[in-house]
Amino acid sequence: MARYTGPVTRKSRRLGVDLVGGSSAYEKRPYPPGQHGRARIKESEYRQQLQEKQKARFTYGVMEKQFRRYYAEAVRSSGKTGEQLLQILESRLDNVVYRAGLARTRRMARQLVSHGHFTVNNVKVDVPSYRVSQYDIIDIKPKSLNTLPFEVARETAGERPIPGWLQVVGERQRILVHQLPERAQIDVPLAEQLIVEFYSK
């Protein structure tokens, strides 16, 4: 399945979650699109589970096949499957760049990673789905530091809270991964148990 490249605000309204991050268009009309968008629809259990899975997929920009792999890995892990799945999604490099405030959206973070602006433990990484580990050190490449995206990130530092499992240090905007996130540190409005139920059928 190809990555979704359509109108993100419309998809946000369809799924009932802001996929952009601070989208004024979504805030004005947080109900489903269409002539009867405001109408209440009694949702089946399956529909609720499917919608929650889609919310997770589109929030993190993950295709179905990859999402299934993440779920299978979460099942094999110790701990609650839903929480393990969210931890896997949060530990993607593109998400870490977004969480650290170096990109306004996850889409932008994915693009910055793909363009080769980052190193992890002094090794260039240009794969957005790369998974960080505890104690990893993520740096912006020196030649990229003074490019517009990172100048803007420095100017807007502090506008969005950085989760406690990450730290951004100094003018070089080095990201330190102190730990992988616990469920309480993940503020995405997802009911992960519904995703577990969807795949358990």
From Swiss-Prot:
User: Which Pfam families does UniProt cross-reference here?
Assistant: Ribosomal_S4, S4
> Where does the S4 RNA-binding domain start and stop, copy by copy?
91-157
Q: Which Gene3D superfamilies match?
A: Ribosomal Protein S4 Delta 41, Chain A, domain 1, RNA-binding S4 domain
Question: Which UniProt keyword terms apply here?
Answer: Ribonucleoprotein, Ribosomal protein, RNA-binding, rRNA-binding
**How is this protein annotated for GO cellular component?**
small ribosomal subunit
Highest taxon above the source species? Bacteria
Which molecular function GO terms apply here?
Answer: rRNA binding; structural constituent of ribosome
Gene Ontology biological-process entries = ribosomal small subunit biogenesis; translation
In residue numbers, the region (Disordered) covers 19-41
* InterPro entries linked: Ribosomal_uS4, Ribosomal_uS4_bac-type, Ribosomal_uS4_CS, Ribosomal_uS4_N, S4_RNA-bd, S4_RNA-bd_sf
The family annotation for this protein states: Belongs to the universal ribosomal protein uS4 family.
Its annotated function is as follows: One of the primary rRNA binding proteins, it binds directly to 16S rRNA where it nucleates assembly of the body of the 30S subunit. With S5 and S12 plays an important role in translational accuracy.
Q: Which HAMAP family does the entry mention?
A: Ribosomal_uS4_B
Q: Give the quaternary structure.
A: Part of the 30S ribosomal subunit. Contacts protein S5. The interaction surface between S4 and S5 is involved in control of translational fidelity.
Official protein name in the record = Small ribosomal subunit protein uS4
User: Which gene produces this protein?
Assistant: rpsD
